[in-house]
Amino acid sequence: MLSPKVLVRLVDSQQQILLLSSALCSPQQLSRRFLTPMQAYEQRIESKELLPDKVQKKTTQELEDLYNTLKNYQPKPVRVETSSGGGFFGRFMKKEQSAPKIELLNTTAPKGMYIYGSVGGGKTTLMDMFYSCCDDIPKKQRVHFNSFMSKVHGLIHKVKQERGPQDRAFNSEKPLPFDPTLPVAEMIANESWLICFDEFQVTDIADAMILKSLFTHLFNEGIVCIATSNRHPNDLYKNGLQRSNFIPFIGVLLNRCNVAAMDSGVDYRRIAQSGDTNYFVTTQTDAKSQMERMFKILCSQENDIIRPRTITHFGRDLTFQRTCGQVLDSNFEELCNRPLGGSDYIQIGQFFHTVLIHDVPQLTLLLKSQMRRFITLIDTLYDNRVRVVISAEVPLDQLFSFTDKPKDLADEQRMLMDDLKLGDTDTSASVFTGEEEMFAFDRTISRLYEMQKKEYWEQWAKHR
């Protein structure tokens, strides 16, 4: 019998390789390979992994149509040609220029999909199912939107560093206009032209201000975007700071994505919840002993000792006092009272497979910064399929309370206003009112319910 290496040498085309690999697979391995999104959906209904849902089926049909369109698609970038001369004399004679107009040029690429609806309706499940069906698209990625934007900001920083001395217009001290999102978009599109974004949300002004130029360039490169969100595109960055500068991005998104509303009124994450729980209420049980017992069990499965650990990220040290292998035993103060951001939580989610969080208080708008960090933390851990054990002051459904509101802005909010040169009229922006946190808490509670399930705890190994 020929070895796999010899067999591969006999094959010329990618299609033949796929056929050969299928011949070498067992029927069980093939059961979910080479299926279309609709076939995969119906198979999951038949196996009772999913419950029949008319809204989900309608969205799956739209994904099926896109899947068929992408079979014969190859991206063809459309770029603006620049006519300015190069070399010494070209740079010497350059006149002072305004920033070039950034507009959609590539309208031949298939439109992607923007799937929005309430929490737990199956948006991410359907997108992941679609993604897994696209086996014959090598240049693809599935990414949480916060992680994607963290990478984008890192690439922008790198591009600016590598650019070197900036060209200046003739007889002017001003540097010539430079758009770092263009080379960043080219790098991203060269790596992946099918991009599936989970939890497309915009809460950060630094993200909001670059999305129009970034995605215009990405779409001009020919990328196809699939996104899930809890908000309609028109409601993204609602009441955000300087939203007027963000609104043009909504037009770009609507131009290149079909919008699918997906709201069946059912939160499937809460259905058939396991009897076991990894959420302990301090007033109802000896939560401290329960958490310590869980930590000892988890440590027994690690090849390490209990010790502090430091993660270095972008030149910054992030130290945790109690870890064992890939298990982190932490508390709310260590994770949410410190000024940590999305990129820090991404590092935690990628380094640890299990995180214990002690002493989570009831979260009110008096703790708005900590509330925002906790929401970001849970989103990131969920996306990385990290297992979570929590001890909290109140039951899960009471974890967020919006009855108590601060009378004055916190010091860090005042600092933000000073940095952006904002006046008192801007205090109604969502970053100050807590509107985004109020909108996001349903998703966080829903995910915490799912993260207690046995099925969730058993699947983490697949993502490592």
UniProtKB/Swiss-Prot annotation:
This is Putative ATPase N2B. Pfam families: AFG1_ATPase. ATP binds at residues 117-124. It comes from Haematobia irritans. The keyword Ion transport does not apply. NCBIfam families: ZapE. Belongs to the AFG1 ATPase family. One of its GO terms (cellular component) is mitochondrion. Keywords: ATP-binding, Nucleotide-binding. GO terms for molecular function: ATP binding; ATP hydrolysis activity. InterPro entries: ATPase_AFG1-like (IPR005654), P-loop_NTPase (IPR027417). It comes from the Eukaryota.
